[in-house]
Amino acid sequence: MGQKVHPNGIRLGITKPWNSTWFANTKDFADNLYSDFQVRQFLTKELKNASLSKITIERPAKSIRVTIHTARPGVVIGKKGEDVEKLRKAVAVITGVPAQINISEVRKPELDGKLVADSITSQLERRVMFRRAMKRAVQNAMRLGAKGIKVEVSGRLGGAEIARTEWYREGRVPLHTLRADIDYATSEAHTTYGVIGVKVWIFKGEVLGGLAAVNAAAAQEQAPAKPKRDNKRRGK
């Protein structure tokens, strides 16, 4: 049977950046890796209602910088920044070094693989029909400019006795093209009948220029929008 390599792993360093960017010697590598895991586990649990996309970690000069990519930055920041300050102190305790937390807003959650997968799982847990949830996710992604999307759900769909896998695809999803920008994510829906797995592949177009072009596009997307000039003459 044909098996699929992880779409994100095979593109690391080509069109996908690493989620943790730091260098450590042999003695400290395992400790840093484990503290990264603990930080991600803690933040994922604390921000389960904040539409969390991904967490990137950097370690400059005996400190840690965590960037939280979310579709709902207001929920993460909290009133007057109280919630994000609590998170910063908790991360500093977990890692044992000074911590800094940055918030990055996901402008189009319908084109983010993790957010789409989480949206489908939340609908399945609310007993929405799986076909309706899949079709809605596909239509929203294509409407906002995706070149292609594939959604797969597997488990006891609709409470059936025998588990099965169903998928729905629209557009192109070229998994073998390394320059293709494929956003892949998984999630799990915990229902009364058992666990239903959800996989999402979103093809956003081809990247020419490698990782440098991806980073430049991401920086441009995060830049604040310039206010539009009003050319109309103001009345007295």
UniProtKB/Swiss-Prot annotation:
Function as written in the Swiss-Prot or TrEMBL entry: Binds the lower part of the 30S subunit head. Binds mRNA in the 70S ribosome, positioning it for translation.
Which domain of life, per UniProt?
Answer: Bacteria
GO cellular component terms, A-Z: cytosolic small ribosomal subunit
Keywords in alphabetical order:
Ribonucleoprotein, Ribosomal protein, RNA-binding, rRNA-binding
What organism does the record attribute this protein to?
Answer: Aeromonas salmonicida (strain A449)
Q: What GO molecular function terms would the record report? A: mRNA binding; rRNA binding; structural constituent of ribosome
Q: What protein name does the entry list?
A: Small ribosomal subunit protein uS3
Return the InterPro entries for the record. Answer: KH_dom, KH_dom-like_a/b, KH_dom_type_2, KH_sf_prok-type, Ribosomal_S3_C_sf, Ribosomal_uS3_bac-typ, Ribosomal_uS3_C, Ribosomal_uS3_CS
Quaternary arrangement and interactors, per the entry? Part of the 30S ribosomal subunit. Forms a tight complex with proteins S10 and S14.
> Which Pfam families has this protein been placed in?
KH_2, Ribosomal_S3_C
State the family it belongs to. Answer: Belongs to the universal ribosomal protein uS3 family.
| Matches recorded under HAMAP family | Ribosomal_uS3_B
Annotated GO biological process: translation
What region holds the KH type-2 domain?
A: 39-107
